[in-house]
């Protein structure tokens, strides 16, 4: 059991980091998708206005 502890600690740390990065990745995805939709809507309204 002693040999498993360092590996388990490293894995737990890696898992915590991965969860944190996935959270950042989702935030970026939301921003990018929101910006893309915003740009498309802006172009649509801009072409109607002119």
Curated annotation (Swiss-Prot):
Q: How does it sit in the membrane?
A: Single-pass type I membrane protein
What does this gene product do? Answer: Self assembles to form a helical capsid wrapping up the viral genomic DNA. The capsid displays a filamentous structure with a length of 760-1950 nm and a width of 6-8 nm. The virion assembly and budding take place at the host inner membrane.
- One Pfam match: Phage_coatGP8
Q: Which family does it belong to?
A: Belongs to the inovirus capsid protein family.
Record's subcellular location: Virion; Host membrane
Q: Which named protein is this?
A: Capsid protein G8P
Outline which residue ranges sit on the Periplasmic face: 1-21
Q: Which residues lie on this side of the membrane: Cytoplasmic?
A: 43-50
Q: Does the keyword Transit peptide apply?
A: no
State whether it acts alone or in a complex, and with which partners, per the record: Homomultimerizes. There are several thousands of this protein in the phage capsid.
Any one GO CC term of the record:
helical viral capsid
Q: What residue ranges are annotated as transmembrane?
A: 22-42
Q: What gene name does this entry carry?
A: VIII
- Species this protein is from: Enterobacteria phage ZJ/2
In terms of InterPro entries, this protein maps to: G8P (IPR008020), Phage_M13_G8P_capsid_dom_sf (IPR023390)
Question: What keywords would UniProt list here?
Answer: Capsid protein, Helical capsid protein, Host membrane, Membrane, Transmembrane, Transmembrane helix, Virion
Major location category of this protein:
virion
